[in-house]
């Protein structure tokens, strides 16, 4: 049986760390930033670690070879 392919959209959005955690960018930075404070905008920079259950689902269904 052949290996499962990784979903190409997930490949661009998520990164699996060496310890198996799943990292992703913060949501909510595409538009509507005028309503947010400078602190809120600043806190949305960079990446975040997903909750364990969400990360496990991402790895199982979208990143099977990670």
From Swiss-Prot:
Q: Cell membrane: present as a keyword of the record?
A: no
Q: Could you tell me which cysteines form disulfide bridges?
A: none
Q: Does the keyword Ribosomal protein apply?
A: yes
Q: Which GO terms describe its molecular function?
A: structural constituent of ribosome
Q: Which UniProt keywords apply?
A: Ribonucleoprotein, Ribosomal protein
Pfam family, any one: Ribosomal_L35p
- What highest taxon heads this organism's lineage? Bacteria
State a GO cellular component annotated for this protein: cytosolic large ribosomal subunit
Q: Where is this region: Disordered?
A: 1-40
Q: Which InterPro entries does the UniProt record give?
A: Ribosomal_bL35, Ribosomal_bL35-like, Ribosomal_bL35_CS, Ribosomal_bL35_sf
Kindly list the biological process annotations in GO that this record carries: translation
Gene3D superfamilies tied to this protein: 4.10.410.60
Bias category Basic residues: which stretches? 1-15, 27-40
Family matches, as NCBIfam families: rpmI_bact
Q: Indicate the family of this protein.
A: Belongs to the bacterial ribosomal protein bL35 family.
Q: Which protein, by its recorded name, is this?
A: Large ribosomal subunit protein bL35
Question: Which taxonomic lineage is given here?
Answer: Bacteria, Pseudomonadati, Pseudomonadota, Alphaproteobacteria, Hyphomicrobiales
**Gene name tied to this protein:** rpmI
């Amino acid at each position: 049986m052949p290996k499962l392919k990784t979903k190409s959209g997930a490949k661009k959005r998520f990164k699996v760390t060496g310890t198996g955690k799943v990292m992703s960018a913060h949501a909510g930075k595409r538009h509507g930033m005028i309503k947010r404070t400078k602190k809120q905008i600043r806190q949305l920079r960079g990446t975040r670690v997903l909750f364990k259950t969400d990360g496990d689902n991402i790895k199982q269904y979208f990143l099977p070879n990670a």
